[in-house]
């Protein structure tokens, strides 16, 4: 009964630097939700003289967006990116698509009852820890997820 929103990631390799002038930006009314400029996190994320953009597209598993070809996803996104004057298609060196079926928890009515049932079942297992966004059915930030990971490692070490 626990449901997740899926994620399609479009990675765009470009020679253009400072596309966003920030680490990431959220968008509405676009085929994507967020664009992250990886070089603004660290210049070591890309080869010299290249920049990597991560374009995030949330969808439902096997829906119309999920089932688009890699080329169709790219064309749909680059059209909006060009319209916003962030990047020209001619600036793109290459692109790669990755699909993840279960990323963002969907908090439907009574989800907590279903989650409790799952956790009771998992608690019967020894040496099994359900962690991370998917394992805890929790939409937390990366620092929170890292903390949960460290806490779990401490439990295992004891």
Predicted features by range, described:
Residues 1-87, 98, 117-121:
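Mid-domain catalytic core of redox enzymes
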Residues 35, 90-96, 128:
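Generic beta-strand hydrophobic packing signal
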Residues 37-48, 100-137:
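FAD-binding beta-loop-beta segment adjacent to the flavin cofactor pocket
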Residues 67-71, 108, 142-143:
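Conserved strand-to-helix beginnings and helix N-cap segments that scaffold or border functional pockets
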Residues 83-93, 158:
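Surface-exposed helix-capping loop/turn segments at secondary-structure junctions
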């Amino acid at each position: 009964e626990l449901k997740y929103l899926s994620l399609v990631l479009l990675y765009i390799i470009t020679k253009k630097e400072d596309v966003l002038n920030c680490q990431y930006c959220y968008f509405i009314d676009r085929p994507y939700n967020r664009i992250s400029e990886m070089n603004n996190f660290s210049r070591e994320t890309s080869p010299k003289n290249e920049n990597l953009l991560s374009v995030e597209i949330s969808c439902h598993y096997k829906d119309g967006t999920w089932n688009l070809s890699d080329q169709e996803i790219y064309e749909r996104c680059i059209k909006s990116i060009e319209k916003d004057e962030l990047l020209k298609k001619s600036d793109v060196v290459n692109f790669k698509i990755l699909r993840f079926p279960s990323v963002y928890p969907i908090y439907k009515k009574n989800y907590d009852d279903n989650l409790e049932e799952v956790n009771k079942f998992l608690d019967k297992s020894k040496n099994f820890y359900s962690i991370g966004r998917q394992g805890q059915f929790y939409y937390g930030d990366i620092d929170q997820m890292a903390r949960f990971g460290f806490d779990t490692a401490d439990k295992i070490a004891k």
